[in-house]
Design a protein with these regions (language model features):
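A short, structured N-terminal alpha-helical element that caps or precedes a catalytic domain
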Residues: 1-158
Length: 159
């Protein structure tokens, strides 16, 4: 290509082509009908709220109910998908707090190994709630362990 040469981009579709179905967000049923689960699908979507990472010097804990995951699971259930929730912070009884190897953070909740044990073998999508960037170092290790044990799982992370 020469410096003065103009590149003309020609789209492969016409601008008036209706290739995206318009959905009315005010009507959940019409929206869900576009995303319904395949019939007799035994696969599972697992949603996880991992353990909480708390700075050692913190006097408060950001532990809250995983309402976001509950909302997502509710919509997926309504669309016909099989869902499971792992609340790694709320499921651990009695509550145990562990210190990280660098002695800077406390971890509250199930360990990575305990989370791995709770993942349904039929899981094809694993959604993980990553609310705070300060937790990324610990949750990344969890994601790596999940991918190693279940290499075909699609992992979706969000906050």
């Amino acid at each position: 290509m020469k410096d003065n040469e103009t590149i003309i981009f020609k789209p492969t579709y016409t601008p008036n082509q209706n290739w995206v179905k318009e959905l009315d967000p005010r009507h959940m049923d019409s929206t869900l009908s576009a995303f319904t689960a395949p019939k007799n699908d035994k696969r599972v979507i697992t949603l996880c709220r991992p353990f909480v990472v708390i700075p050692k010097t913190s006097y408060s804990s950001p532990v809250t109910l995983p309402l976001g995951l509950a909302y997502v699971a509710s919509v997926l259930d309504k669309a016909g998908y099989k869902t499971k929730i792992i609340d790694a912070t709320g499921e651990q009884r009695p509550v145990k707090i562990k210190r990280t190897s660098n002695n800077l953070y406390n971890l509250q909740g199930l360990t990575s190994e305990e989370i791995l044990e709770r993942i349904d073998p039929n899981t094809f999508i694993f959604g993980i709630s990553l609310m705070f960037s300060s937790e990324w170092f610990a949750h990344r290790t969890l994601i790596e362990k999940i991918k190693k044990k279940y290499p075909k799982i699609i992992i979706v992370a969000g906050g």
